[in-house]
Structures are given as C-alpha cells and as structure tokens.
Amino acid sequence: MLITLSISCKRDTDIVDPTPVVNPGQPTTPATGAVTPVAAPEGAAITAIIGPAGGTIESADKRIQVQIPAGALTTSQTISVQPLGQNNCPAGSGQAFRLTPHGLTFAKPATVTFQYTSKDVNGTAPELLRVAYQTDKGSWQSPSVKGLDTTARTVSIQTTHFSDWGLFKSMYISPDQSFVNPGGSQQLRVFQTGKPLVEGDELFVPLPTLVDTKYIEKWSLAGAGTLAHQHNTGDYYAPETIPATNPVSVTVFLNKTETIDGKVYKDLRLVTSIFVAPEGVSIQIGAGGAWQTFPGGANINSTQNIILGKTGDTFAMVGWVGKPTGVYQWTAGTTVSFVSQNGPTMTYSHLYGKNVSGGSLQVNNEHETWVVGTFTLTSSGWIESVPPPKYGTTSIRGVFRVKRV
C-alpha cells in the first residue's frame, strides 16, 4: 500500500449521477469456473516426510503452511511445497504454491494456511480473501474459509487433497492502486468472483464480473479532486496541481457481511489509492511556490538508494541508506539526504550549517513499474554563490513518480 504524506486534507463533494440505468453488474446466470493455464514452478521445493502421527510443513518464506493431523495418513509420505511463477487463479493475489503429491487423499482434513501481506489486500479486505485450488481440468475451486486472523494476517481452509493453491480476492475495487497526472482521471470498477450456491459448498471460481449493486452502500473520496460514481463504477478526476496529500484514496463501503468460523464481519470496505503527480521529480520551494518537475529515475540498491531528477544544470536528488520502502528522517550526514541545484548559482540542502532540517522522506518501492514518494523540508539550507554569497533557509515540498534505472 502506498505511503501518505499528510500536510493537509481536503474532502471534495462526491458527484453522483441521479439518472437510473440498468446495472451492468447484475448477474443473469450462475457463474462457472474459469479455466486457466497451469503455472510453472519457481524456486526449490521444501520437502518433509510425514506419517500417521501427522506433522507440519511450510514454505521457505512462511507464506503457506500445511498441518496434517494424526490419522490423516496411513503410511509415511514425502510431502512437498513449491512456489509457482504465477498465481493464475481469477483475481489471484500474492504467491501461489504447488502442494504434492497430487492424487493423495487424506482420511482427515489437513489445514492449509496462507499468510497475506498488505499488498495482497490492496483494493480488498482481509475478510474478502479466499483460498482456491486448481483442478486437473484447469478450473479453480474454493473451499469455505475456516479461519481468519487479522493480527497474524492468515487465512485458513481445510482440504483432503493436494493441488496448486493460491489466494484470491472475492470482491475488490480495480485498479487497487493507480498513478495519474494532475488534471488526469482514473476509471474505477468494483468486481466480484461469485458466491457458492449453497452456504458451505465449494465455490467454482469464475472470471470476475462487476459486483451486484445490492452490495454497494456508498462511495467516498479522501483528498483533493472529485469523484463521480454510479452503482459499481466510478471515475476519479485529479486536481490541476499536485495535491497536498498523496496519495488520495477512494473507499467503497459494502452492504454485506462475511461469516467466518461463526464470527460475523461487518463494515467491509474496499480502498484504492491514487497517486497524483507527473512522472519525474517535482519540488516546490517556499510556501506557495511554483512546482518544478524534472525527468528522472530511481537507483535502488543495497548500498545507497538515489532518486534523481535533472534538466540541464538544475536538479533535485534524495538519497537514503536502508530498505527501499519506508519513512526516513533527514540526517547530519548522507545517510538520508536532499540536495538541489537551481541553476548555476543556487543550491539547497537538508542541512543549514550543522543544523538538520525537520521533515521526512517517504518512499514506496512496491509497485512493479513506479517508485513513488513524497518529502518535506521545514528549514532547507540554501546558498546563493554569486559574490557576495548569501545564505538562508526555506521550506521545500517534493514528490516523485519515477521508474527504476
């Protein structure tokens, strides 16, 4: 999920089209299971010999765990867990795994537990995650969820056989995160992957369709811009300038509950984040100053991470040592730093003499295409090198949306 810099917050009035239309998401026939390719393995398998006494096996990254109870097996078996290159389940989220041997039937159900990440629930909610397996015909089926632990971030089901397994979103807003230019727009849609015809039955996982509008309670926008929505679709319109809060968020409140292991979950919401910034590195010098945007890129590595935007002899750069996603305070050295050259004579820094500016750098490196973030300096030191040199401090805001180089 993207990191938010909260300088100020503005909530614009939603724009709702009152004209009734036929709901494009209203299902007319029962959904059937979607057939997808079988994914190739990726990485080494973890194996364990488990016999009649039962046992546990988990993946190297602990994203999946299988607990086989005593009495489930009559003889010792070599059980393996192997990550797959793709999660091909419709609306799949996160890593998929191959559990073998296929064709083995347990006398008692085994428990399969997936650990989800914050990225896995982008655009959905933990209560709406489900687990599915791929059949020998290529379709996907989902047993009912037997356990949800939102503290440990785990979802569990029970099964009497092995196959290829993965998480998927039973209901979600798409895209779950997006990036638009100031003045641009983003189309939003709410999808579902169906419900079992009989409670407790396995769900044949179909291709996602627009959600039945009876499940939509309302839409809400937090941040600058405007939101037009109708039933299960919406459109976000970004402000003409870089907003004070990035990203903005759109929330769809659902008119439904989920019951998992006897517990009823209410107040379900789907949230998508929208990062509003031009491609490149943008800075605003002084309160109310004009934004300047420079083309640039990100060099993310284990030694020193750099975000640099440059046009001619004018540039802006932030650097930090540490994880590629996080929140960092400026330091006296170059561990977390900012420098900008504005023409041949004007230089800005996160330092003013020995004083370190207040503010912070916030970076998100989780998206496959973009590295995005924001930064503030409450008292950036500046020097004008034209004789006689002049010195001072000013505030600086920055935002970046760049690709890795």
Specify the residue positions occupied by each region the protein language model found:
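Proteolytic cleavage junctions
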Residues: D12-Q65, A72-S76, C89, G103-L104, ...
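Flexible, membrane-facing loop/turn or short amphipathic-helix motifs
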Residues: G280-I285, M346-S349, G381-Y391
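Edge beta-strand at a domain terminus
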Residues: Y172, T376-V405
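Extended extracellular/luminal ectodomain segments enriched in beta-structured repeat modules
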Residues: T105-A110
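Catalytic cores of nucleotide-enabled group-transfer and carboxylate-activating enzymes in metabolic
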Residues: G43, V112-S118, G398
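One face of beta-strands
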Residues: I64, Q95-F97, T334, S357-L361, ...
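Surface-exposed helix/loop patches within compact recognition domains
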Residues: S282-Q284, G288-W370
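C-terminal motif of bacterial Sec signal peptides marking the signal peptidase cleavage site
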Residues: L5-S8
